[in-house]
C-alpha cells in the first residue's frame, strides 16, 4: 500500500498539490498436489467492500486450482518467522519542510516536485507467519535557473528532514549556477585536459 502527497513548484511558488493512495493485495493458493495459483486485486480502503472482493477472489482461486497442472518445482518454507518493522512518521512534517523550501527559494527561479509518503508491505500465510514493514520518506527533485535559462538539477531525499543537509545541497547548486552565468567562451578544436565529476563519468560508462 502507498499513501503519498506531492507538491509541484514553479518559479519558487506552489502551483499544484495532490495526494495518492493505492492499496493492492496478492492472494496465493496452493494444495498438496503442488498446484499453485495467484491473483492480484486493487482495494479501496473500505473494509466491507474490500473483504467482499477478497472473498470473491479466493473463491475463484479455489474453483480454478484443481484444473491446473502440477508444478514439480514448487517449494515453500514451512518454518514460521514473523517480523514487524515500522519507521517513525513524525520525523517528516510536510508543512515545515515546504515552509523552509519556499523561504530558501525566495530569490531563486526554482522548479521541482516535492513528494513524501508511506509504503506498507505485509505478508500472512496459513501457517501463522505474519510480517509487516512500513517506511516513510520524502524526495525533493528540483532545478534552479539563472537569467540565461541555464539550470542546475538537484535532489534531496531522506527519511528525516535535516535543514543543514538541504541548505548544503542548495548552496552547492547555487555556486554551480553562478559559474554558468559567466560569459561563454568558445573553445576551438584541439587537445585539452578535462576533469569529469564521478557522476558525469558514470553517465559515459552507462552509454557504452
Where are these regions (language model features)?
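Short beta-strand elements
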Residues: 21-32, 131-159
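Detector for glycine-centered tight turns/loop "hinges" at secondary-structure junctions
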Residues: 12, 125-129, 149-150
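Short helix/loop capping segments that flank catalytic or ligand/cofactor-binding pockets
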Residues: 152-153, 203-206
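Short, charge-rich amphipathic segments
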Residues: 23-40, 96-113, 142
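Short His/Asp/Glu-rich catalytic/ion-coordination signatures at enzyme active sites or charged loops
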Residues: 38-45, 77-91, 145, 149-166
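Short, glycine-/Ser/Thr-/acidic-enriched flexible segments
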Residues: 2-4, 30-35, 147-149, 199-201
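Acidic low-complexity segments
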Residues: 1-6, 51-133, 164-202
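N-terminal alpha-helical targeting/anchoring segments
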Residues: 4-62
Amino acid at each position: 500500500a502507498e499513501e503519498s502527497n506531492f507538491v509541484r513548484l514553479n518559479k519558487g511558488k506552489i502551483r499544484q498539490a495532490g495526494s495518492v493512495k493505492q492499496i493492492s493485495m496478492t492472494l496465493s493458493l496452493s494444495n498438496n498436489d503442488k498446484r499453485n495459483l495467484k491473483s492480484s486485486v486493487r482495494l479501496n480502503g473500505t473494509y466491507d467492500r474490500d473483504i467482499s472482493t477478497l472473498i470473491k477472489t479466493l473463491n475463484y482461486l479455489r474453483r480454478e486450482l484443481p484444473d491446473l497442472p502440477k508444478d514439480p518445482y514448487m517449494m515453500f518454507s514451512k518454518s514460521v518467522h514473523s517480523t514487524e518493522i515500522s519507521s517513525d512518521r513524525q520525523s517528516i512534517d510536510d508543512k515545515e519542510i515546504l515552509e523552509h523550501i519556499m523561504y530558501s527559494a525566495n530569490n531563486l527561479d526554482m522548479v521541482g516536485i516535492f513528494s513524501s509518503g508511506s509504503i506498507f508491505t505485509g505478508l500472512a500465510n496459513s501457517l501463522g507467519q505474519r510480517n509487516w514493514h512500513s517506511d516513510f520518506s520524502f524526495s525533493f527533485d528540483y532545478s534552479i535557473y539563472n537569467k540565461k535559462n541555464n539550470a542546475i538539477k538537484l535532489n534531496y531525499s531522506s527519511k528525516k528532514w535535516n535543514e543543514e543537509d538541504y541548505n548544503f545541497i542548495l548552496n552547492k547548486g547555487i555556486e554551480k549556477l553562478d559559474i554558468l552565468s559567466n560569459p561563454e567562451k568558445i573553445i576551438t578544436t584541439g587537445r585539452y585536459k578535462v576533469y569529469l565529476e564521478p557522476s558525469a563519468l558514470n553517465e559515459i560508462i552507462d552509454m557504452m
